[in-house]
């Protein structure tokens, strides 16, 4: 539950007026985000890292890299329940606002025609920076996940690198061509974001589709989709999962019946619990 704060107009003297969460949080580990900056493609970008519970600097730890959706969205120093769960499970958790994110103006957020290019490079540079700043992270035990645009990037990443020990692709995009004719926003959003002239510009749409590069994938990947998701329809995950299965790569799909694109935020409580359990179990299987 959100607390109520007051502060001066200059942002100083912040005071919390309510304490709704004190009892619930008193016996739980709450990781505090550590902000870091890094340089990628000539720009200074922001990221954050959560340390695992009972952190011991003499030990090596697994990690989770969580990519936000949008791409016009933004992370901050806020409470993210799933990230806190993973930190309590003994993982470092790191996340960042790459090119395409909100919060730094339209020019920064506009990556139309650049999906899979500058954003991918930013994500890899951030991973390198995190490993440099936190040498207790085991580079062979980094898990990666994301939903919506973050699911697109997850699918893109597994087709372009095998540096992550496992991945979880949620409500994702794998094929801009099929999505153009199945998604509620496909006919106009997809060509606009891919820099294509129309939904029939198949060559351009295919160039930006993770499915094109799936034959390069080696990463064990869990796919999570809702069967009532009209934004990123179920077949987007099924195509990518089938491609991995045909290559003999370990893969699994969890379909949540009756849920929508909003499963992780406003789905039925039992489904939200099951979703997070499936993700965490996948991480534990491959990183512990």
Task: Tell where the protein language model's regions lie, with residue ranges.
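Active-site-proximal cap/loop segments of hydrolase catalytic domains
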Residues: 95-288
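Low-complexity, intrinsically disordered regions enriched in charged/polar residues
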Residues: 8-11, 199
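Structural motif
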Residues: 1-6
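Cap/lid segment of the alpha/beta-hydrolase catalytic domain
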Residues: 11-12, 18-140, 147, 179-181, ...
């Amino acid at each position: 539950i959100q607390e109520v704060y007051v502060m001066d107009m200059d942002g100083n003297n912040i005071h919390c007026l309510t304490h709704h969460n004190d009892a619930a949080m008193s016996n739980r580990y709450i990781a505090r985000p550590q902000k870091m900056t890094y340089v990628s493609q000539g720009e200074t970008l922001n990221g954050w890292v959560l340390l695992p519970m009972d952190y011991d600097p003499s030990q090596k730890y697994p990690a989770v890299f969580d990519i936000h959706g949008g791409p016009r969205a933004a992370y901050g120093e806020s409470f993210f329940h799933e990230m806190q769960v993973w930190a309590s499970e003994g993982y470092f958790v790191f996340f960042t606002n790459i090119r395409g994110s909100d919060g730094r103006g339209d020019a920064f957020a506009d990556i139309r025609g650049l999906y899979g290019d500058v954003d991918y490079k930013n994500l890899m540079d951030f991973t390198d920076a995190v490993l440099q700043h936190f040498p207790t992270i085991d580079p062979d035990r980094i898990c990666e996940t994301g939903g919506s645009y973050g699911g697109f990037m997850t699918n893109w990443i597994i087709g372009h690198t095998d540096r992550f020990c496992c991945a979880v692709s949620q409500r994702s995009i794998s094929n801009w061509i099929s999505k153009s004719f199945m998604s509620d926003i496909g006919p106009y959003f997809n060509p606009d974001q891919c820099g294509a002239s129309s939904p029939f510009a198949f060559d351009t749409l295919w160039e930006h589709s993770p499915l094109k590069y799936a034959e390069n994938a080696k990463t064990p990947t869990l796919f999570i989709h809702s069967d009532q998701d009209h934004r990123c329809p179920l077949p987007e995950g099924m195509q990518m999962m089938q491609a991995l299965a045909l290559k003999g790569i370990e893969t699994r799909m969890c379909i949540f019946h009756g849920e929508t694109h909003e499963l992780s935020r406003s789905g039925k409580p039992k489904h939200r619990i099951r979703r997070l359990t499936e993700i965490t179990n996948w991480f534990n299987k491959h990183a512990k």
